Amino acid sequence: MGARASVLTGGKLDRWEKIYLRPGGKKKYMMKHLVWASRELERFACNPSLMETTEGCKQLLQQLEPALKTGSEGLRSLFNTIVVLWCVHQGIPVKDTKEALDQLQEAQQKGKQEVAAATADGTSTVSRNFPIVANAQGQMVHQPISPRTLNAWVKVVEEKAFSPEVIPMFMALSEGATPQDLNTMLNTVGGHQAAMQMLKEVINEEAAEWDRLHPVHAGPVPPGQMREPRGSDIAGTTSTIQEQVGWMTSNPPIPVGDIYKRWIILGLNKIVKMYCPVSILDIKQGPKESFRDYVDRFYKTLRAEQATQEVKNWMTDTLLVQNANPDCKSILRALGPGATLEGDEPAFQGVGGPSHKARVLAEAMSQAQHSNDAKRQFKGPKRIVKCFNCGKEGHIARNCKAPRRKGCWKCGQEGHQMRNCTNERQANFFRETLAFQQGKAREFPSEETRTNSSTNRELRVQGGGTCPEGGSEERGDREQAVSSANFPQISLWQRPVVTVRIEGQLKEALLDTGADDTVLEEIELGGRWKPKMIGGIGGFIKVRQYDNVTIDICGKRAVGTVLVGPTPVNIIGRNILTQIGCTLNFPISPIETVPVSLKPGMDGPRVKQWPLTEEKIRALTEICTEMEKEGKISRVGPENPYNTPIFAIKKKDSTKWRKLVDFRELNKRTQDFWEVQLGIPHPAGLKQKKSVTVLDVGDAYFSCPLDENFRKYTAFTIPSVNNETPGIRYQYNVLPQGWKGSPAIFQSSMTKILEPFRKQNPEIIIYQYMDDLYVGSDLKIELHREKVEELRAHLLKWGFTTPDKKHQKEPPFLWMGYELHPDKWTVQPIQLPEKESWTVNDIQKLIGKLNWACQIYPGIRVKQLCKLIRGTKALTEVVTFTTEAELELAENREILKEPVHGAYYDPSKELIAEIQKQGQGQWTYQIFQEQYKNLKTGKYARMRSAHTNDVKQLTEVVQKVALESIVIWGKVPRFRLPIQKETWEAWWTDYWQATWIPEWEYVNTPPLVKLWYQLEQDPIPGAETFYVDGAANRETKLGKAGYVTDKGRQKIISLTETTNQKAELQAIQLALQDSEVEVNIVTDSQYALGIIQGQPDTSESEIVNQIIEELIKKEKVYLSWVPAHKGIGGNEQIDKLVSSGIRKVLFLDGIDKAQEEHEKYHNNWRAMASDFNLPPIVAKEIVANCDKCQLKGEAIHGQVDCSPGIWQLDCTHLEGKIILVAVHVASGYMEAEVIPAETGQETAYFILKLAGRWPVKVIHTDNGSNFTSSTVKAACWWAGIQQEFGIPYNPQSQGVVESMNKELKKIIGQIRDQAEHLKTAVQMAVFIHNFKRKGGIGGYSAGERIIDILATDIQTTKLQQQISNIQKFRVYYRDSRDPIWKGPAKLLWKGEGAVVLQDQEEIKVVPRRKAKIIRDYGKQMAGDDCVASRQDENQNME
């Protein structure tokens, strides 16, 4: 038996004996089970010695498992025993046999997956997510990306918002993807425009770098050989999926997918850095921050760092220790380099917490060593000292770390000290009467006498009952849900010390909600223990850890870990308190107020109260008196200078009055709020529930307190009739109706209040929008209503009432404008009014009702009704209905006659969306899960551009429906679209980057969407070629349009009231009209080309509609563009024909000079057009022919804060060197310099040089260490410069200088070969940017613009001073022949012969001789010797 029992030894045997035979059972595995198993194995002809190793157990399990299906219960027991034994050998922690079986099953599945993966790797080298597989003919073909993968990617981006986790998720989801797959993934998240723009820029830069490093080989590509991919091919914009597959599967392969993915990851890293701008160097542990929280922050930031894994490993090894607080740093160093965060985390327990200021481990160890040395050196008899305070040996009361006990240390009575004590009795400081006498909760003062202050805290143990001595059993769930008044309560005016029973032993212990663990002084507990060191009040102490110890506290039993050691006081920690439901309570817990402030630099409203009728004053006085009694408002005195006007209106269908406050002025001055809820919940998103209740919160806003510091700004006044008495002034104590902050603060407060109820009742669904609550569950109706009453009681505890009047218990439920039934929903009944005459206001209301109805009534249209009220019309203006609008309204009335209902959402079924074309640019859609049971319907009639087609509009409808579905149901439906695959593919080929739509299928629902015509990609051989052109004179509006053909035909027509763009289109229409069914057309108008290449089938332009009609008649049309004035035969000929008498003569002798200057400076087209008097098209063509200027398009210039004194500074890197760039925000003027190091000293020197050249008021920088240094701050202080720091990812923040960094690098790249050193190239690039590039505001160069801005600023300031001086004077004047002097009037301007003045609202010019100018002395009366006409008129007014 000894040999068989030796299967497990040491710690493994201890773990074996802790595992239960059954879940929830009492029996555990013992030694005898091992002996029995070995005998049974011999009976089954198996080797028992295999039980001694993990591998042996695995072999036994493989042998026994096939026989389980037909085996006996004994065989199953043997198998279970071997499974548990295998877990013990493996070191897998399990509590019982069932957990062991689960662990085995997991291990087996994992093994199968690894085998399958190894097999797949051995047979195929292509991706498993996006496989490129061989078809039946042996060709490699691509399987497209699945909607599930796309949905997962969209969900990641929406939930993680470009946090560091996005990058590994993208890498996983895009494993083996082609560039086309990657572009599809990017298009699905195209709504994040700013992030996608950054990504696009990185991809463009990488593509340009690829082209530079992989130049195209001269000559044609040999037959049978694939061309080499360019940067744009890798990005998927100029390559087909067949080419991408070919490159990826060629020999040797070119992994274009992996290359493109690497570029995207570079861009994602940049985006992540913007979203997570904190540097790893800034992550430092706070003095009171726990080590775990610090490590979490450290690794989260580390994931966002753009560095190699080696660098990140170095950061972990050095920075993690370096930036820890002193306590944790010393512990980390003491633990040594071999320590692991998981294994040594207990060493940091209590370190850095707010209630435990621990000493460092090294110090504790050294103290222990010193004490041992001292003991060895101690000689003579040992004197035992005993503490009077805690009664323990080893220290005296003066050095006692336990809290001081009240009263005499000898007898325990108060009123005297121990030295004056006459009693012989020893005090019992741990007597049971301290907190609970004979097991009962001590009595407390009544609610009336108890203070309402936040210091009146109580510990409450959930569940009634007596203390352990009473021996009461646990009660049922229903008995536990008693009112809080029956819970044992322990006041925190004194220390909460109670008697607890630990494994049958009584102990006094302190209930400590701030302690993690339960720590007791010396107590004998049976069983095994393990050593541990913890941080306590007096430093580190060594303790013994006992697991699964039973503790009884106040009739509640808990089983947990107990630490035993030399603690100054017994502590029951959170590991036990949470099990018994002990909570820290505040008897009266007011809703926490949200701090509110005014906008910076603004003061409260000071609007006078307007007069009110006696009836309204009486009503307001009555309302305010009642509100004052309820505490909603309180009176204020004259010290409050603010006021907001109030008035009263009668309620609908009632004689009662309603108080209204005009908070418009306060709303302008109050800070902005973020709406917590961005939309209203929709019934189509509700899951069908067996039991439903709808509640309404009464006086919602008046239940939430307003920030005390903000209340003074809500003051208002009730006046008295005829000013009989001073007005009564009040201010709000709660959220006022009509104030802009009330909705957001109420929603936030309501969410916090409902959160605990939601956690305690996960089976209850609560939809909350403002004061409307929808409560649904699958409980029986009686139990559901009990839960609703609990919710109402919970809300009432926080001061929110739910009136019975609006408590809906039976269907149909009226909620949010909808009508809810148990199995369906609809909108509340809609009645369309019948009117003889309709005003603009009536039609607006009518359209609103129809728009509301269209979410469930399919087919509703409002386009013709909307046309009736286009333009700026008065609300009361009568509108005449058109025939189309009358017909549309009649159709809508018919639709609304039959009631329509919507279904509820079933998560187990698929979402389907079907779209129909209604004609006239209107579309309808239905979203359903079962046919004819719509969840929701809707319409779409928006034209995003003047010229569009049905395919483009269809994609817009799909995107609207997809977005709506994600909002309501959290996923994208499968679409059924009225368009054939061939039609879609024909349009998608050219416009795949324009938009994204998910998986869809064709449904034959007339009218089908089709492309009415298609333009050819190459010239049509044999077809006549028309060179077309049009021209117009801007002044006379006269023009010509015409064509010439390659066969000698020509035609010119004259036009009136036209423009250049119209004339160009007219010429194309003329060519289409006079040509055969196949035609080639050549134009020099980019405008016309852009419209027609979009293949529109409808347009707001009459001429474009005519062109569309002509295009539909043609079989083949090829349309091409050539630049004007370039000597192209037919183009030049027609240009001369249409220009005669129309266009002004153009002198183009400056082209050569412009080309020469561009080769030197690479200036932009605007600068050349301005400097050399060239047409824009010619200047653009010069830029287009320059290979160095075709890397990227020009940046789109926006506008930020354009104050003249604001500069943005940033450091950028090029060729391994640092360039410090400063940009004048208003003008775009740039100063840049190569600096030797990115230090505060160099930055401060640069700022002082900049301030010496230009007036710098504000500099805006990022949070780099050089900009935040004290040297830079000192330089800014000396130069009087205000320094601001950027907000990450804010376009108003660092956008200008970031854009200029790219522009500077672009210019440097164009002229780099002209300079030997980078610092020279930088200064040359700055010169080119400032003086050789024109555009933007005013068409100036940046250098001209900054001078113009500064000069204008000086002139404006001077003019304001002059105006200010002039306004100090008043004018008396005589008008025509009237001898009476008039005045005083305001002086506006003083000239040599006349003055301009303003008398009341009239402005007059008066001759100088008829005017007398005097200084304005205010209301001071002039004396007898002060005559206005004697004032000196020649005072300096400049």
From Swiss-Prot:
The gene is gag-pol. This is Gag-Pol polyprotein. A motif (Nuclear localization signal) lies at residues 26-32. The record marks 219-220 as: Cis/trans isomerization of proline peptide bond. The record marks 130-131, 361-362, 428-429, 487-488, 586-587, 1026-1027, 1146-1147 as: Cleavage. Pfam families: Gag_p17, Gag_p24, Gag_p24_C, IN_DBD_C, Integrase_Zn, RNase_H, rve, RVP. PROSITE patterns: ASP_PROT_RETROV (PS50175), ASP_PROTEASE (PS00141), INTEGRASE (PS50994), INTEGRASE_DBD (PS51027), RNASE_H_1 (PS50879), RT_POL (PS50878), ZF_CCHC (PS50158), ZF_INTEGRASE (PS50876). Residues 630-820 form the Reverse transcriptase domain. A motif (Nuclear export signal) lies at residues 16-22. Keywords: Aspartyl protease, Capsid protein, DNA integration, DNA recombination, DNA-binding, DNA-directed DNA polymerase, Endonuclease, Eukaryotic host gene expression shutoff by virus, Eukaryotic host translation shutoff by virus, Host cell membrane, Host cytoplasm, Host gene expression shutoff by virus, Host membrane, Host nucleus, Host-virus interaction, Hydrolase, Lipoprotein, Magnesium, Membrane, Metal-binding, Multifunctional enzyme, Myristate, Nuclease, Nucleotidyltransferase, Phosphoprotein, Protease, Repeat, RNA-binding, RNA-directed DNA polymerase, Transferase, Viral genome integration, Viral nucleoprotein, Viral penetration into host nucleus, Viral release from host cell, Virion, Virion maturation, Virus entry into host cell, Zinc, Zinc-finger. Residues 813-821 are annotated as: RT 'primer grip'.
